[in-house]
Swiss-Prot record:
Cellular compartment(s): Cytoplasm
Coiled coil: none
The entry's keywords: Cytoplasm, Isomerase, Porphyrin biosynthesis, Pyridoxal phosphate
Cofactor dependency: pyridoxal 5'-phosphate
Protein name: Glutamate-1-semialdehyde 2,1-aminomutase
Chemical reaction(s) catalysed: (S)-4-amino-5-oxopentanoate = 5-aminolevulinate
Residues bearing the modification N6-(pyridoxal phosphate)lysine: 281
Length: 448
């Protein structure tokens, strides 16, 4: 699968273009996270000047219906009044102390009350820190070196987890990016997702050396791919049988697909619960906040209570915890129902428009998260299937939507996110844009 070559979008964004040029002189690639650069779709990334509710406004003054929601955190919509008030009040008391605060206790209590397997919680500042710390803790707790992950699952830019599959089943991984050494990735094994046989084989070969299996609760970075029925339970059974920990990465799904994240949405109960979970995105309300937590006996191995070191100057930052606490408290059952209603309306309209235009596609869901695969396959359940997309069709679809004032994720391999603020007017604008975008996708099919 080759990367598409950049091509200009049909609409004009001169201020964004000028900012992108300036940014490229002082920021590698002109962005602070690669997907923002539009390399997968071509054209000029839109520089956002402001956001409110379901809308983004770019530096050229153009408004877009936002289907990124900051890649997931903005479940209430942008600049929600409750969150804005909480952040404003917290800022009046100072920005950072380097000491414990009541708010971090309140936020930890809120999460522990929501997610039954989480008995204790440690806060950090990013999802990458959360997964990095969780696998360190798993190794420290078990005394074992090997981590098992799934192909296509993304857990942040952790050296040990930036690894691709080897040439055969359950082979030790090679690093997937320059700068990650074979030593860093050498104790990581990558196996196919939703494959119980591969899981059994890797434990047959290496079971006494495996510290943990880490999995996205529902994959969202190869497009949305949920675990197949029975797979989560099998993960729990096999890891428990071999004395390995099960780590569920809920950075994306946590507090978005339900009040208790994927754990609550899937509803398998404590019998099949993971030992450790990681959180981010929604729990920070748009601010840098994340966490990892789980069984008290495992968490007790963290410093200062135990020997596994982990620390952070801004962990539990008072403004970030204020935003997170206000966000979670505002996430009522009515909010989750509104998000689900909005997501259902958009995904059904997208599928109908693509079908009418004769574009082969498949819509995968995980709660209110979803993605559209531009594929003729009947199902997408793993990374190899997810990669079989018509990227030319997606690229044309993306730019048509953008030109009509709807900002999708600029990659065919990302989830679409909606918020409780996506009202009938916002959804109507999306629905109105879809037929032309679907026709553009049909014309762009196979162009890459």
């Amino acid at each position: 699968m080759t990367a598409p070559t950049p091509a200009p979008t049909t609409s004009s964004a001169p201020t964004s273009a000028a900012l992108f040029e300036r940014a490229a002189a002082v920021i590698p690639g002109g962005v602070n996270s690669p997907v923002r650069a539009f390399r997968a779709v071509g054209g000029t990334p839109r520089f956002t000047a402001s956001a409110r509710g379901p809308y983004l406004t770019d530096a050229d003054g153009r408004e877009y219906v936002d289907l990124l929601c900051s890649w997931g955190p903005m479940i209430l919509g942008h600049a929600h009044p409750d969150v804005l008030a909480a952040v404003t009040a917290a800022a009046q008391d100072g920005f950072s102390y380097g000491t414990p605060t009541e708010r971090e206790v309140l936020l930890a209590e809120e999460i522990v009350a929501r997610v039954e397997p989480v008995e204790q919680l440690r806060m950090v500042s990013s999802g990458t820190e959360a997964t990095m710390s969780a696998i360190r803790l798993a190794r420290g707790f078990t005394g074992r070196p090997v981590i098992v992950k799934f192909a296509g699952h993304y857990h942040g830019h952790v050296d040990a987890l930036l690894a691709s599959a080897g040439s055969g089943l359950a082979t030790f991984a090679l690093p997937d990016t320059p700068g990650v050494t074979g030593t860093a990735a050498g104790d990581t094994i990558v196996i196919p997702y939703n494959d119980p046989e591969a899981l059994a084989e890797v434990f047959r070969l290496h079971g006494d050396r495996i510290a943990c299996v880490i999995t996205e609760a529902a994959a969202g970075n190869m497009g949305v791919v949920a675990p197949q029925p029975g797979f989560t339970a099998e993960l729990r059974r096999v890891t428990r049988e071999h004395g390995a920990l099960l780590v569920s990465d809920e950075v994306m799904t946590g507090f978005r697909v339900s009040a208790a994240g994927w754990y609550g949405h899937e509803g398998l109960g404590l019998e099949h619960a993971p030992d450790l979970l990681t959180f981010g995105k929604v729990m920070g309300g748009g601010f840098p906040a994340a966490a990892f937590g789980g069984r008290a006996d495992v968490m007790a191995h963290l410093a200062p209570a135990g020997p596994v070191y982990q620390a952070g100057t801004l962990s539990g930052n008072p403004i970030a915890t204020a935003a997170g606490l206000a966000t979670l408290r505002a996430c009522t059952p009515e909010v989750y129902a509104a998000v689900e209603t909005a997501a259902t309306a958009v995904r059904e309209a997208a599928s109908a428009a693509l079908s009418a235009a004769g574009v082969p596609h498949l819509v995968n869901t995980a709660g209110s998260m979803f993605s559209v695969f531009f594929t003729g396959l009947d199902a997408v359940t793993d990374y190899e299937q997810a990669r079989q997309q018509d990227l030319g069709a997606f690229r044309a679809f993306f730019h048509s939507m953008l030109d009509q004032g709807v900002h999708l994720p600029p990659s065919a391999f990302e989830a679409w996110f909606l918020s409780a603020s996506h009202d009938e007017a916002a959804i109507g604008r999306v629905v109105e844009a879809l037929p032309a975008a679907a026709r553009a996708a049909a014309e762009g099919s196979g162009s890459l």
